[in-house]
């Protein structure tokens, strides 16, 4: 169905600059808007057009797609940055008609508990549909499952299989859950040759004034230790979902250079990937 994916944002849920942040990372982005970044989302191109995640920047992100008619929405989970754009499908804005909403049963339940989003279903702006297809395969992963579950999504194409994994708690939990010893083994088992991978934090001491352990994500440093240097048969690994504090936002940083020197990549808004 789809033959191309566009990365519509590479930042964590709150984007960059982030509300309330007065550190250099966000002050730089306020002074120079070329440094601002939208939250992670994917544009799906083919005979029809879809979007993965509905961020607060959904209007700008659909513009980045070419302002194309959206026939379906996929959600990996329901943390605010991945779902808050749903309201834009309502009658105050787009007033869409029967756009398919594809998400897990627990996310369906979560949507229906919230009056603003429930109205979108009742008014026919959105219609729940199956959370899988012949070429799009959700894969459950551990990630703060108090209210709903979280999934990675595998997109299967003629040329590439692309795994989208913006959020998970730890490699230890995820690998235990999927029953593989290391990330590369898991990626290989999925026949995935492009990985859009959770790169939220560079290290475990990145957040100031907050307990970082309360926002669990594998750090990029840890992931690099696990996957090492890219070899000829390895998939492309592209780090996405970068927190506003992450030095990978700066291409001239030592951290960015370390990623690329090992043969891996950092996602950029507008990046196109063929399926």
Could you tell me what each predicted segment is?
Residues 71, 99-108, 196, 238-240:
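Short internal beta-strands
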Residues 67-69, 91-97, 120, 186-191, ...:
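Short, conserved loop/helix-junction motifs that constitute active-site signature segments
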Residues 12, 80, 108, 202, ...:
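Residue-level marker for beta-strand->alpha-helix junctions and adjacent short loops that shape enzyme
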Residues 105-117:
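A short, active-site helix/loop in glycosyltransferases that binds the activated sugar's phosphate group
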Residues 161, 169-270:
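Cap/insert and terminal regions of metallo-dependent hydrolase folds
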Residues 122-128, 134-138, 261-265:
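Active-site regions of enzymes building and remodeling cell-envelope glycoconjugates
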Residues 1-65, 128-183, 188, 271-275:
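Core dinuclear metal-dependent hydrolase active-site scaffold
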Residues 47-102, 193:
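Active-site metal-binding motif and surrounding structural segment of the metallo-beta-lactamase
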């Amino acid at each position: 169905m789809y033959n191309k994916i566009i990365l519509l944002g590479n930042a964590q849920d709150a984007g960059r600059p982030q509300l309330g942040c007065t550190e250099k990372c966000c002050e730089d982005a306020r002074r120079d808007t070329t440094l601002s970044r939208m939250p992670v989302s994917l544009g799906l191109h083919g005979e029809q057009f879809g979007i993965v995640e509905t961020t607060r920047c959904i209007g700008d992100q659909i513009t980045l797609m070419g302002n194309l008619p959206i026939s379906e929405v996929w959600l990996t989970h329901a943390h605010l940055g991945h779902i808050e754009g749903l309201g834009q499908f309502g009658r105050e804005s787009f007033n869409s008609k029967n756009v398919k909403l594809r998400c897990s049963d627990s996310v369906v339940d979560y949507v229906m508990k919230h009056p603003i989003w429930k109205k979108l279903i009742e008014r026919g702006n959105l219609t729940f549909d199956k959370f899988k297809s012949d070429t799009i395969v959700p894969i459950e992963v551990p990630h703060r499952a108090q209210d709903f579950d979280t999934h990675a999504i595998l997109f299967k194409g003629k040329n590439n299989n692309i795994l989208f994994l913006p959020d998970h708690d730890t490699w230890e939990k995820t690998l235990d859950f999927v029953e593989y010893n290391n990330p590369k083994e898991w990626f290989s088992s999925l026949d995935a040759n492009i990985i859009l991978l959770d790169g939220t934090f560079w290290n475990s001491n990145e957040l100031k004034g907050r307990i970082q352990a309360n926002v669990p994500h594998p750090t990029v440093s840890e992931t690099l230790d696990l996957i090492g240097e890219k070899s000829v048969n390895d998939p492309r690994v592209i780090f996405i979902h970068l927190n506003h504090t992450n030095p990978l936002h700066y291409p001239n940083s030592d951290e960015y250079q370390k990623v690329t020197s090992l043969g891996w990549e950092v996602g950029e808004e507008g990046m196109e990937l063929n399926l």
